[in-house]
Amino acid sequence: MEIHHCENPVCRFVTRHAVPDMCPLCGGAFFLPSDGSDLVAADWVTLGIESKTDGRFDDAFSDFEKAAAEGDAAGQCMLGLAYETGEGVAQSWPDAVLLYRAAAGQGHAQAQCNLGWCYEFGKGVPQDAKAAARWYGEAALQHDPRAECCLAICYTNGTGVAADPVRAVQLYTLSAQAGFVPAMRNLAQMIHLGRGTAKNDEAALAWYQKAAAQDDARALFMCGQFYEKGFGVESNAPLAADFYLRAARQGYAPAQACYAICLECGRGVPANPTEAVQWYTRAARQGDTQAQFALAVCCEQGTGTPQSWGDAIRWYSMAAAQELPQALLNLGLCYERGAGVRRNPEEALHLYRRAARLGLPAAENRIGALYERGDGVEQSWPTATAHYRRAAEANYAPAQCNLGWCYEYGQGVPEDLTLAAAWYGKSAAQGFARAQCCLGWCYEFGKGVELDEARAVELYRAAAEQGLPRAQCCLGYCTEKGIGTEADPAAAAEWYRRSAEGGYSRGMYNYACCFENGTGVKKDLPLAQQWYERAAKEGLPDAMYELGVWYEDGRCGPKDAAQALAWYKKAAEAGHDRARKAVERMEKLV
């Protein structure tokens, strides 16, 4: 390609592009062709940058090489960059460092900064944090914005220099004020965290917004975070979602994951689970662990995508491989339950232990459950209780409830109803339904606490309204008998119904009693028998015995001594005393 330069000997405009109508530097209208012999090093640098911008890397390398051969620092630096990136030449860190060093020795700020980076990360030279900081410092003295930012990072992290967040903030500020976007972001983070300066979310957001105005993906993402969480500004879900989307479109994985959450939950945008899965997938394929985990949950539950245990296991495994605690836990649950994989409690235990080492209380709780059952390990109440305690002391509500149960029944620890009630209370205070029900029982019967039937009903109701069948049954019983509340047979029957339909055998039994006696519902013996049968099939001895009575007396059809005896025997085998006596009585008659 032919070279032209401005005829003005003072003007250094030079180009391989089509000759413009007017020189952009001096306004001249005449240009002369050149074979290169009349060009100086700075001209070759200009031509090299033009070629690099056009994507003509071979020409760029040749141009920079000519400038560097004349000892030009800018040419040496740009040639070093070509060796660093492998543009127009085979990539070579040692050659890049050699050229950066030559230019840095001439005081070229960009080369000094580049050389510092090579020392910081051990590229072409042995890693040397102190040398990195020293070269960053040389460039920063010339007010190179990138070097100021790099040196600030050193002071932030104590890399090659003593950590000094105040000095870091000073350098970030200089760099940010010069328009260097990464420094704007880092300065915003320091201000948000209150490191090296007073915490000020409004000021932090202002810097993020300045960087976002340059369409910087990370800054856009952080603006989304601030508007979502209300840091330094009133929470604004639609605006947060818009910032996430702008960053997500640039391929920034954390923003893609957050925008997917907005779509899945309808937060700031109309709910669209299908589109959410698409964004989760984009982020997950980039290795974003939170997106991998969220995508696995969607695949497991069939949210926005067809249900697929295979895909769920695959994404859980990817996130678990990156040591995401919740992914390790969920993958462990899959192995414990045999969901999507062959059941393997030993592998589940291994995964739970990895998650527990990362500080996840829920994993400690699952380890406790395996030891409680002796599932994949030798059964050990003391070991189970120890793991429950670790999770409970980390304020994990299910473990607090489990530990309370251990104290109530003296499993792995000495029986202590006061401690049982105390742990139930900690769990119940967090809204954990099972603990609310257990604590309600303590108050109803004065176990470990002062008897308080009204408080018991209050706790039963809290758990029942969360859908816990046992609590619904307990609340039904209190409501039927007027314990801690006014008697209301109709309301009692309704709570029994909910409990029964939730699969709780005692709720089925009590609901059957309602139909048998017309308590809160119209008397209906066939329905009563159906619910007794369902309760009996769930293994409730009282229901088995009651069916024996019904068949013996013919309460809902012809008498059937054989059926009666069969049900009495089942109840007796389950430890029901009246059923045992009934068996003895009937066998004597035979």
Predicted regions and their residues:
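Cys/His-coordinated zinc-binding microdomains
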Residues: 7-15, 27
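Short helix-capping/linker turns of helical repeat alpha-solenoids
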Residues: 39, 69-72, 85-87, 92, ...
